[in-house]
């Protein structure tokens, strides 16, 4: 056991208790009165995390920390940092699960005073579920909207699917756009430009072709958008529609656990983590940022939409209903390639992610916690690893049940097997992203500069 282990941990525990007490008091004073159902259980969830960072630690905590730092050796310092890092990951689990209970799956009331919505659907190719996905937008329960379908070519095989639905629902205002408009190196932005320029309504919903929309999904997003005058971006938490097969279950499990945890916790703590598969924006606010053409030089345009809007003082939120991805062509290998592509994007946009990305999953973080506690207080490594894994698995399973809001399409045993596969493959996906930084998306190959900007192709 480390010479200073017990005394240091006791000092940290005492000081942390005081800080938590001060934070709770400050939040209670700053939070306006709320309904009894939310004020007691979810008080902290309504306060942006950045406000908590303004709290000043007590003087004795600072003095104690300085004394500890003067006595620490490098190994002990690394162990303390490791313990704090993994403890924060434990808190992220709790925040994500609590916020999912608070924010997701609420009933939405109809409101004819809400503004109209222009729904932009960029489409490339088709799969067996495309008809079902597109039809869910033709049947959406919203009083005023238009559907704007964007194709690179009139020869795209998905064009006939859309035309068939336009004939089936002639009362729905739907238009087709072909060829796009080149405003940058991002093909999705180029594809959407004609539709964006012709949009009639003040709210823009960008929705990928693989998204199935609940009948009240657009209403839910518009209601969230108009809940605050400074709200300019509303996204749906990425999830998946129930489908048969191991590959579909693997994809659904990822979005219901690892991805869902970070997305929900990030939105709760007011971080920019927007995703573009189903996102609604105020056109006026977006035009203030230069319109979507201003983001044609970035591959992850959805993230930069959110960042620029936040920089201009606008708010963002998630809607009550998750985005239901419903592609029929998913496979484990293609999905892992997709996740690898996202890792490459994050590394290019936020280089410091290199320090965190490979350590935030279950088994790497479990090893960090086990060796940290072994060094600090002499606990055996194996029991810590077992307890850590049980906690991680239990919280992931609980979060996925919350995201699902009903019975899962697979058993707990199947969930465990899929969960293990996902956790074991995560480090290899990260290594592949480091070794092969070039991004291949559909038929295009991209090279990114630090910061996420697309580099022009080499001649």
Swiss-Prot record:
<keyword id="KW-0808">Transferase</keyword>
<feature type="short sequence motif" description="D1">
    <location>
        <position position="156"/>
    </location>
</feature>
<dbReference type="InterPro" id="IPR025993">
    <property type="entry name" value="Ceramide_glucosylTrfase"/>
</dbReference>
<dbReference type="GO" id="GO:0016020">
    <property type="term" value="C:membrane"/>
</dbReference>
<dbReference type="InterPro" id="IPR029044">
    <property type="entry name" value="Nucleotide-diphossugar_trans"/>
</dbReference>
<dbReference type="GO" id="GO:0006679">
    <property type="term" value="P:glucosylceramide biosynthetic process"/>
</dbReference>
<dbReference type="GO" id="GO:0008120">
    <property type="term" value="F:ceramide glucosyltransferase activity"/>
</dbReference>
<keyword id="KW-0472">Membrane</keyword>
<dbReference type="GO" id="GO:0002119">
    <property type="term" value="P:nematode larval development"/>
</dbReference>
<keyword id="KW-1133">Transmembrane helix</keyword>
<keyword id="KW-0443">Lipid metabolism</keyword>
<feature type="transmembrane region" description="Helical">
    <location>
        <begin position="77"/>
        <end position="97"/>
    </location>
</feature>
<comment type="pathway">
    <text>Lipid metabolism; sphingolipid metabolism.</text>
</comment>
<dbReference type="GO" id="GO:1904508">
    <property type="term" value="P:regulation of protein localization to basolateral plasma membrane"/>
</dbReference>
<keyword id="KW-0746">Sphingolipid metabolism</keyword>
<feature type="transmembrane region" description="Helical">
    <location>
        <begin position="415"/>
        <end position="435"/>
    </location>
</feature>
<protein>
    <recommendedName>
        <fullName>Ceramide glucosyltransferase 3</fullName>
        <ecNumber>2.4.1.80</ecNumber>
    </recommendedName>
</protein>
<keyword id="KW-0328">Glycosyltransferase</keyword>
<keyword id="KW-0444">Lipid biosynthesis</keyword>
<dbReference type="Pfam" id="PF13506">
    <property type="entry name" value="Glyco_transf_21"/>
</dbReference>
<dbReference type="GO" id="GO:0042661">
    <property type="term" value="P:regulation of mesodermal cell fate specification"/>
</dbReference>
<comment type="function">
    <text>Catalyzes the first glycosylation step in glycosphingolipid biosynthesis, the transfer of glucose to ceramide to produce glucosylceramides (GlcCer). GlcCer are known to contribute to the physical properties and physiological functions of membranes and may regulate signal transduction. Seems to be the major active form in the nematode. Only branched-chain sphingoid bases like 15-methylhexadecasphing-4-enine are used for generating complex sphingolipids in Caenorhabditis elegans.</text>
</comment>
<comment type="similarity">
    <text>Belongs to the glycosyltransferase 2 family.</text>
</comment>
<dbReference type="GO" id="GO:0005886">
    <property type="term" value="C:plasma membrane"/>
</dbReference>
<feature type="transmembrane region" description="Helical">
    <location>
        <begin position="367"/>
        <end position="387"/>
    </location>
</feature>
<keyword id="KW-0812">Transmembrane</keyword>
<feature type="short sequence motif" description="(Q/R)XXRW">
    <location>
        <begin position="338"/>
        <end position="342"/>
    </location>
</feature>
<feature type="active site" description="Proton acceptor">
    <location>
        <position position="302"/>
    </location>
</feature>
<feature type="short sequence motif" description="D2">
    <location>
        <position position="208"/>
    </location>
</feature>
<feature type="short sequence motif" description="D3">
    <location>
        <position position="302"/>
    </location>
</feature>
């Amino acid at each position: 056991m480390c010479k200073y282990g017990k005394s240091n941990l006791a000092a940290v525990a005492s000081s942390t208790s005081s800080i938590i007490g001060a934070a709770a008091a400050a939040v209670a004073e700053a939070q306006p009165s709320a309904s009894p159902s939310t004020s007691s259980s979810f008080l902290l969830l309504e306060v942006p995390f950045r406000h908590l960072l303004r709290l000043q630690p007590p003087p004795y905590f600072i003095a104690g920390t300085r004394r500890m730092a003067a006595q620490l050796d490098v190994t002990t310092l690394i162990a303390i940092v490791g313990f704090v890092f993994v403890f924060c990951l434990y808190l992220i689990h709790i925040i994500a699960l609590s916020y999912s209970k608070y924010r997701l799956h609420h009933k939405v009331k109809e409101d004819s005073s809400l503004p109209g919505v222009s729904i932009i659907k960029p489409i490339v190719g088709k799969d067996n579920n495309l008809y079902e996905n597109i039809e869910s937008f033709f049947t959406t329960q919203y009083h005023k909207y238009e559907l704007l379908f964007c194709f690179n070519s009139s020869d795209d095989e998905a064009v006939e699917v859309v035309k068939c639905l336009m004939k089936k629902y002639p009362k729905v205002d739907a238009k087709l756009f072909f060829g796009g408009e080149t405003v940058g190196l991002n093909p999705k932005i180029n594809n959407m430009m004609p539709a964006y320029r012709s949009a009639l309504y003040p709210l823009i919903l960008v929705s990928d072709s693989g998204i199935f929309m609940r009948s009240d999904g657009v209403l839910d997003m518009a209601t969230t958008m108009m809940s605050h005058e400074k709200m300019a971006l509303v996204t749906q938490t990425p999830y998946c529609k129930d489908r048969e097969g191991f590959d579909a279950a693997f994809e659904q499990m990822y979005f219901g656990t690892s991805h869902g945890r970070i997305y929900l916790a990030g939105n709760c703590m007011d971080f920019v983590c927007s995703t573009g598969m189903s996102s609604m924006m105020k056109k006026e606010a977006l035009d203030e940022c230069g319109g979507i053409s201003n983001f044609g030089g970035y591959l992850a345009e959805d993230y930069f939409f959110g960042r620029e809007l936040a920089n201009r003082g606008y708010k963002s939120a998630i809607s009550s209903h998750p985005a239901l991805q419903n592609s029929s062509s998913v496979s484990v290998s293609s999905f892992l390639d997709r996740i690898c592509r996202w890792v490459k994007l994050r590394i290019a946009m936020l280089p410091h992610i290199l320090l965190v990305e490979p350590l935030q999953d279950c088994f790497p973080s479990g090893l960090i916690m086990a060796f940290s506690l072994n060094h600090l207080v002499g606990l055996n490594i194996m029991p810590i690893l077992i307890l850590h894994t049980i906690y991680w698995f239990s919280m992931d399973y609980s979060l996925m049940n919350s995201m699902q809001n009903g019975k899962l399409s697979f058993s707990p045993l199947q969930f465990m097997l899929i969960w293990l596969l996902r956790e074991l493959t995560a480090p290899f996906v990260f290594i592949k992203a480091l070794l092969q930084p070039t991004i291949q998306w559909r038929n295009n190959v991209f090279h990114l500069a630090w910061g996420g900007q697309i580099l022009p192709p080499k001649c």
